[in-house]
Design a protein with these regions (language model features):
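ABC transporter nucleotide-binding domains
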Residues: 2-214
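Solvent-exposed beta-strand sheet faces enriched in polar/charged residues
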Residues: 7, 233, 262, 297-299
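Short phosphate-engaging motifs
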Residues: 18, 196, 239-242, 278, ...
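Short, surface-exposed acidic/glycine-rich loop or hinge patches that mediate macromolecular interfaces
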Residues: 65-68, 212, 237, 276, ...
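A generic structural signal for secondary-structure junctions
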Residues: 79, 105, 144, 226, ...
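ABC transporter nucleotide-binding domain
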Residues: 175-273
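C-terminal coupling/interaction segments
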Residues: 274-337
Length: 337
């Protein structure tokens, strides 16, 4: 049974489309990964789900409730942790959690018990009674997660919860999310970290340019690709012209299914091949054209390969493309709507 149903969502900011016919179903009790580059529409989707933003069209159903018609009812079962941490720098972490508990009308004894439990689970004992203005980014993120969990939500929505964090804070958050998943909490986790979604998610969707382009378990998506992945270089850094020349040479090699130029990695070539037996053919074709292999690495399919198969570019290439198009002022205006 699906706890979340997003049907044909459309959303634009002025003339710029953010979501285009986005449809998604998240099973109850599942840790569901939402993977895509910055600017793909992840935050817009989560803000609509959290009843903080209205779509131009489409339906949002949470636990059988129409979130657009009854947002108050949905908010009672939902915990939302936004990408941008917003905390009062004057309060201590404990005081902020107490305030959050009061806003949820939790009885004082229950509120304090939950606060103590979250302090323990998120390893905040050493600094929880210091003012929030003294906290590091990892401390603030853990506190923000604790605030989102204080009312024991049935559904937890997380927007890039570990972006920019130190390894210790990331490990703590991963452990908590795995425990919540085991206890039956439904979690929608937005991320552009491939390894995070691969490690944590039971099911996932990949989003690009406001559309869901792939959906399933991480293993299903990787296995569906078939073949081995080969990363090839003829020198440490090639240019676009040389990379295209090599691609054209290798396209005709028997057993080579697909070749994509990875601009973000010095114009290396990402190949999909039928197996080990194809590698000598690749090396021979290069040698016949007076080209030597600088480096060659073979691996099984990854989530980046899934993204590459669906879009023709790697996730890092997509990140770089978005970074070059960004308008910080426009992004701030959009986030305030």
């Amino acid at each position: 049974m699906s706890l979340i149903e997003l049907d044909h969502l459309e959303k634009s900011y002025g003339m710029v489309p953010a979501l285009t016919d986005l449809t998604l179903a998240v099973p109850e009790g599942c840790l569901y990964g939402f993977l895509g580059p910055n600017g793909a529409g992840k935050t817009t989707t989560l803000r609509i789900l959290a009843t903080l933003l209205s779509p131009d069209s489409g339906r949002v159903i949470v636990a059988g409730v129409d979130a657009l018609e009854n947002p108050r009812q949905v908010r009672q079962i939902l915990g939302y942790v936004a990408q941008e941490v917003a905390i009062d720098k004057i309060l201590t972490g404990r005081e902020l959690l107490a305030l959050q508990g009061d806003l949820y009308h939790l009885p004082r004894t229950e509120r304090n018990q939950r606060i103590d439990d979250l302090i323990q689970r998120l390893s905040m004992q050493e600094w929880i009674d210091r003012r929030c203005g003294t906290y590091s980014g990892g401390m603030r993120r853990r506190l923000d997660l604790a605030a989102g969990l204080l009312h024991s939500p049935r559904l937890l929505v997380l927007d890039e919860p570990t972006v920019g964090l130190d390894l210790e804070s990331r490990a703590v958050i991963w452990d908590v999310l795995q425990d919540l998943r085991d206890q039956g909490t439904t979690i929608l986790l937005s991320s552009h970290y491939l390894e995070e979604v691969d490690a944590l998610a039971e099911r996932m969707a990949i989003i690009d340019a406001g559309r869901v382009i792939a959906e399933g378990t991480p293993e299903e998506l990787k296995c569906a690709l078939g073949g081995d992945r080969v990363t090839l270089r003829v020198r440490e850094f090639s240019d676009q012209v040389e990379a295209e020349t090599i691609r054209d040479l290798l396209d005709a090699v028997e057993g080579v299914r697909r070749i994509v130029i990875n601009r973000a990695q010095g114009h290396s070539l990402n190949l999909v091949v039928d197996g080990d037996h194809v590698l000598p053919r690749i090396q021979k074709r290069l040698g016949d054209n007076d080209l030597r292999v600088f480096s060659l690495a073979q691996s099984r399919p990854s989530l980046d390969d899934v993204y590459l198969q669906a879009t023709g570019r790697t996730l890092m290439d997509a990140e770089l493309a978005v970074a070059g198009q960004r308008d910080p002022k426009q992004e701030r205006r959009q986030s305030m709507r």
